[in-house]
Amino acid sequence: MAEDDIKIVMFCCNWCSYGGADTAGTARMQYPTNIRVIRVMCSGRIEPQFVLKAFREGADGVLVTGCHHGDCHYDAGNYKLDRRMRLIYKLADELGIGRERIHHDWISASEGEKFAETVKMMVNRIKDLGPSPIKKQLAEA
């Protein structure tokens, strides 16, 4: 799969990981442009159906990022995300998407380099996996 064809949706917490994207940008760190960032107020607000809809709309992979444990602006949002991610990974496997197309990580506002490296890692992973199997199913329908 050509790197330019890869589409990744990235859910970013408003208070930390979105700030990490800003830090990466202001520091002029290089990372692939294959991501589409969706800012959410808290990673704990990310529902499984958001991730599934991203695949249904043509994403090849999904990144979910939030504050480190103990740093959540809303106290326990990242712990809620931990529980939801277990469900999301299970659903991805059961639906034939594959959990390897989804990654979640904790990125603070000061971790621009980690933001850029996480994006690069995900693009390389999706490049190796190829297009989402959901794309093929939708094309045949």
UniProtKB/Swiss-Prot annotation:
Cofactor(s) it depends on: [2Fe-2S] cluster
**Pfam family of the protein (one):** FlpD
Query: Could you give the cofactor binding note from the entry?
Result: Binds 1 [2Fe-2S] cluster.
One Gene Ontology MF term? 2 iron, 2 sulfur cluster binding
- Disulfide bond sites: none
Listed A to Z, the keywords are: 2Fe-2S, Electron transport, Iron, Iron-sulfur, Metal-binding, Oxidoreductase, Transport
**Record-linked InterPro entries:** MvhD/FlpD
Q: Which residues form a coiled coil?
A: none
Q: Could you tell me the EC number(s) of this protein?
A: 1.12.99.-
Which family does this protein fall into?
A: Belongs to the MvhD/VhuD family.
Listed under subunit, the entry gives: The F420-non-reducing hydrogenase is composed of three subunits; MvhA, MvhD and MvhG. It forms a complex with the heterodisulfide reductase (hdr).
Functional description taken from the UniProt entry: Part of a complex that provides reducing equivalents for heterodisulfide reductase. MvhD may form the contact site to heterodisulfide reductase.
- Protein name (Swiss-Prot/TrEMBL): F420-non-reducing hydrogenase iron-sulfur subunit D
Q: What is the lineage of its organism?
A: Archaea, Methanobacteriati, Methanobacteriota, Methanomada group, Methanobacteria
- As recorded in Swiss-Prot or TrEMBL, the protein's gene is named mvhD
